[in-house]
């Protein structure tokens, strides 16, 4: 992992954004601007991102455990900038508050969390700055969960991708269980029932399948079945030991990488 300084030059009226924090905007000749972004937390190469278009932008504050605030930034296409879509994305703030009670404080608290709209229908958990082509709350909480499970603690090899995707998939269920106003256990059961998979395949990607993108990012095995493995671990350990295990796992492999054997 490494830290990043990235300068993006874009013509007006485009807005350019990336990982980390915006440290400055330089006005250049020819109706251009240079946006300078920087990270202080190390990140993996595949989590680097940048995007530039005629975004509408806004921000809200997340109140941190330490009593401060962290900006939550949103970059949306003008044609999709509606009150309903803004409200949907802003649900990430109560998600942050809920997930910190389960996983610890948001791991990049001195930078930001952000969502930027993209042209594919799912999401991608770039560190501090998620790409989303949807306003679906399940996608939003899944990608937010990756900030702990995938970004802070990253899978060591593509064989181990289930460590990223299984924990993020289970984050969806935990949000259903613990979000404000939740029914608790019934909500957890309902969320997990929608992720059942009884077919063949292992959560660990075999070497022979590493050239197959669809085997690595398989919704049945490396997502849903992996989410059930995490759920079963919780059942076997019990809640206290399970969440203690998550804390130890985070502390041991923070800003590093873990393999299945770990």
Q: What are these regions, as identified by a protein language model?
A:
Residues 78-87, 128-130, 157-158, 214-219, ...:
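Second-shell loop/turn segments in exported
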Residues 191-231, 237:
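Conserved glycine-rich, hydrophobic/aromatic-active-site segments
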Residues 129-190, 246:
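Zinc-dependent metallopeptidase catalytic helix centered on the HExxH motif
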Residues 219-262:
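Amphipathic alpha-helical substructures
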Residues 1-141, 170:
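Hydrophobic helix-coil surface modules that form long, contiguous segments used
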Residues 68-71, 119, 138, 142-145, ...:
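Active-site-adjacent bridging/hinge elements
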Residues 1, 79-80, 153-154, 208-216, ...:
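Flexible glycine/proline-enriched surface loops and loop-helix/loop-strand junctions
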């Amino acid at each position: 992992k490494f830290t990043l300084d990235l300068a993006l030059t874009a013509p007006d009226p485009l807005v350019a954004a990336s990982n980390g924090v915006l440290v400055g905007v330089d006005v250049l000749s020819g109706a251009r601007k240079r946006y300078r972004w920087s990270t202080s937390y190390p990140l993996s190469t595949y989590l680097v991102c940048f995007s530039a278009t005629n975004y509408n932008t806004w921000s809200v504050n997340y109140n941190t455990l330490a009593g401060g605030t962290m900006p939550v930034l949103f970059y949306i296409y003008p044609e999709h900038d509606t009150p309903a879509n803004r409200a949907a994305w802003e649900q990430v703030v109560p998600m942050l508050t809920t997930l910190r009670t389960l996983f610890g404080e948001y791991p990049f608290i001195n930078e930001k969390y952000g969502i930027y709209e993209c042209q594919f229908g799912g999401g991608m958990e770039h560190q501090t700055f998620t790409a989303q082509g949807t306003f679906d709350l399940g996608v939003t909480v899944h990608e937010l969960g990756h900030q702990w499970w995938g970004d802070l603690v990253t899978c060591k090899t593509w064989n181990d991708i289930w460590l990223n995707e299984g924990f993020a998939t289970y984050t969806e269920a935990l949000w259903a269980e613990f979000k404000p106003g939740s029914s608790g256990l019934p909500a957890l059961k309902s969320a997990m029932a929608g992720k059942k998979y009884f077919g063949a395949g292992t959560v660990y990607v075999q070497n022979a399948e590493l050239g197959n993108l669809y085997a690595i990012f398989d919704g049945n095995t490396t997502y849903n079945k992996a989410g059930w493995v995490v759920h079963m671990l919780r059942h076997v350990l019990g809640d206290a030991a399970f969440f203690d295990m998550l804390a130890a796992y985070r502390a041991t492999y923070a800003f590093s990488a873990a393999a299945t054997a770990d």
